[in-house]
Amino acid sequence: WPPPKVSP
């Protein structure tokens, strides 16, 4: 699965 989207 793709990695979780993390906002900086």
UniProtKB/Swiss-Prot annotation:
The modification Proline amide is found at P8. Expressed by the skin gland. GO terms for cellular component: extracellular region. It is found in: Secreted. GO terms for biological process: blood vessel diameter maintenance; regulation of blood pressure. It comes from the Eukaryota. Keywords: Amidation, Hypotensive agent, Secreted, Vasoactive. Both amidated and non-amidated peptides have been observed in skin secretions. The amidated peptide increases the release of nitric oxid (NO) and that NO mediates the endothelium-dependent vasodilatation. In addition, it inhibits efficiently angiotensin I-converting enzyme (ACE) in rat serum (IC(50)=8.2 uM). 3D-structure modeling of this peptide in complex with ACE suggests it acts by inhibiting the ACE C-terminal catalytic site. Belongs to the bradykinin-potentiating peptide family. This is Bradykinin-potentiating peptide Brachy. It comes from Brachycephalus ephippium (Pumpkin toadlet).
